């Protein structure tokens, strides 16, 4: 197998044993990008000069047996809404085209400390608003399994690059499913950690009470290794949680005999495709064969997740994106002749259609006379959804179900139908609304397109999610499939 498809864990061993140099790994990755990414279109910017320089410095440390860092010499790709000092960060928007940050996000500081090597920035839906990566101002990423299909979104570039062997791991952000859904569509592993597990400092805000950074990898253990590296409280993020336990790997191989798994009947109900239902039901049988106890439960407020999410997320986006006005931040219209025109034209020209749609929706929901009817009511529904999960977790360790109701749809199929696009978030948005951790792992294919299985856990219990996902992965994985892509 080419180095480009090696796991994080195997690469770490090869580097530690001096069977390969970090500079060789980085060269192989850039060769793969040059060969494959003109088709996949996952990267927006490459940091080749700095990456090669960093890898050569790591070569010298390797020669001296000074290989410090959990990710020593491991290449990484970063979603383009995560601030990278000195490297363009655009959120895939005309509004931020050419913006080069002068500070580092906390997750990037942590990854640099662990001696990972930044390869480049990855494509996404504009300002993380979308489920297909088609709202990007710059390019449309394709699904490595089927180039006619979308990779999902908003972290579509992050999922596609990992699936195509262009990086062993990437970071994405998840506000309503934006790590897990593309992970499902692209046949990789994607973790949305508990809200507060990972610092949001340096993540360009979409919806501050929902956003969370997480890793995408080709296997479960790699994912746990990366989350260990980026987790932890941060003085720069008041919503980050002071939780000391960031060990996700030591018990990952422990069996799941007796583990209680809840299967909500709503997760296999209306709107979920038959091929997805079949794959999930097969996965449930696999869990039972591994000794888990799987029982049907009800999460009755699941159906309100999408409307509640879109009101809350759009309202927060309306506020967060007000800073992009052409004066303090972002694109500056050259055609304006007055201050009022400057505000209007900069935002009208700088933002894409979907971003403007959500700003309008959020502004409306927060406006006088509608706040109580929409925003306040949505927050009440959010509490009901959280209460549903709390009740289930009194008796169960993990919730299981599909990640997305269908496999990846075709490029261009849903971009002009926002309500159909939003419906794809049916099974992921409740997890964000409740602030819970959720992981997507591959569980099947239909017509060559991957199907994702989602495990949802108790707050800050990513350890159990990794354990059950790892055990399931021993029975089903796509390791041999990636290289054929």
Swiss-Prot record:
Leader sequence residues: none
Q: What is its EC number?
A: 6.3.5.7
Q: Which reaction does it catalyse?
A: L-glutamyl-tRNA(Gln) + L-glutamine + ATP + H2O = L-glutaminyl-tRNA(Gln) + L-glutamate + ADP + phosphate + H(+)
Q: Superkingdom of this entry's organism? A: Bacteria
- UniProt-listed Pfam families: Amidase (PF01425)
Asked if the keyword Ligase belongs to this entry, the reply reads yes
Q: What class of enzyme is it?
A: ligase
Keywords from UniProt, A to Z, are: ATP-binding, Ligase, Nucleotide-binding, Protein biosynthesis
Q: Which GO terms describe its molecular function?
A: ATP binding; glutaminyl-tRNA synthase (glutamine-hydrolyzing) activity
| Record's GO cellular component terms | glutamyl-tRNA(Gln) amidotransferase complex
Active site as annotated: 79 (charge relay system), 154 (charge relay system), 178 (acyl-ester intermediate)
Q: Which GO terms describe its biological process?
A: translation
PANTHER family membership? GLUTAMYL-TRNA(GLN) AMIDOTRANSFERASE SUBUNIT A, TRANSAMIDASE
Query: What is the role of this chain?
Result: Allows the formation of correctly charged Gln-tRNA(Gln) through the transamidation of misacylated Glu-tRNA(Gln) in organisms which lack glutaminyl-tRNA synthetase. The reaction takes place in the presence of glutamine and ATP through an activated gamma-phospho-Glu-tRNA(Gln).
Q: Which family does it belong to?
A: Belongs to the amidase family. GatA subfamily.
Query: NCBIfam families per the record?
Result: gatA
The protein's name: Glutamyl-tRNA(Gln) amidotransferase subunit A
The species is Staphylococcus aureus (strain JH9)
- The gene is gatA
């Amino acid at each position: 197998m080419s180095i480009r498809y090696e796991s994080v864990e195997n690469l770490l061993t090869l580097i530690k044993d001096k069977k390969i140099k970090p500079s060789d790994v980085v060269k192989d990755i850039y060769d793969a990008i040059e060969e494959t990414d003109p088709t996949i279109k996952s990267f927006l910017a490459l940091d080749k000069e700095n990456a090669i320089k960093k890898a050569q410095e790591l070569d010298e440390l390797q020669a001296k047996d000074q290989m410090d860092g959990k990710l020593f010499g491991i290449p990484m790709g970063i979603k383009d809404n995560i601030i990278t000092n000195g490297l363009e960060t655009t959120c895939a928007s005309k509004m931020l085209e050419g913006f080069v940050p002068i500070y580092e996000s906390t997750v990037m500081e942590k990854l640099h400390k662990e001696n990972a090597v930044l390869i480049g920035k990855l494509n996404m839906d504009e300002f993380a608003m979308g489920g297909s990566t088609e709202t990007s101002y710059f390019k449309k990423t394709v699904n490595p399994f089927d180039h006619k299909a979308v990779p999902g979104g908003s972290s579509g570039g992050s999922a596609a690059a990992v699936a195509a062997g262009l990086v062993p791991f990437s970071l994405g952000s998840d506000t309503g499913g934006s790590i897990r859904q593309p992970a499902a569509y692209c046949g990789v592993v994607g973790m949305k950690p508990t809200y507060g597990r990972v610092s949001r400092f340096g993540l360009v805000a979409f919806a501050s009470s929902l956003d969370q950074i997480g890793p995408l990898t080709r296997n479960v253990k790699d994912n746990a290794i990366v989350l260990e590296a980026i987790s932890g409280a941060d003085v720069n993020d008041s919503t980050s949680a002071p939780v000391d336990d960031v060990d996700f790997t030591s018990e990952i191989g422990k069996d799941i005999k007796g583990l209680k798994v809840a299967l909500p009947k709503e997760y296999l109900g209306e709107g979920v495709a038959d091929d997805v239902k079949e794959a999930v039901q097969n996965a449930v049988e696999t869990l039972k064969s591994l000794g888990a106890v799987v029982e049907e439960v009800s999460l009755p407020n699941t159906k309100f997740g999408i409307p509640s999410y879109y009101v809350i997320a759009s309202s927060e986006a309306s506020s967060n994106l007000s800073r992009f006005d052409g004066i303090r931040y972002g694109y500056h219209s050259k055609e304006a002749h007055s201050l009022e025109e400057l505000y209007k034209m900069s935002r009208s020209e700088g933002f894409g259609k979907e971003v403007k749609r959500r700003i309008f929706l959020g502004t409306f929901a927060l406006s006088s006379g509608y706040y109580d009817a929409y925003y306040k009511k949505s927050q009440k529904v959010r509490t009901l959804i959280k209460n549903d999960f709390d009740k289930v977790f009194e008796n169960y360790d993990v919730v299981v179900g599909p990640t997305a109701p269908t496999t990846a749809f075709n490029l261009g199929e849903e971009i002009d139908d926002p309500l159909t696009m939003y419906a794809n978030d049916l099974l992921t948005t409740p997890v964000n609304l409740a602030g819970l951790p959720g992981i997507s792992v591959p569980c099947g294919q239909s017509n060559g397109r991957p199907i994702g299985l989602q495990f949802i856990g108790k707050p800050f219990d990513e350890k159990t999610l990794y354990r059950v996902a790892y055990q399931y992965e021993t029975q089903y994985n796509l390791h041999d499939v990636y290289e054929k892509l």
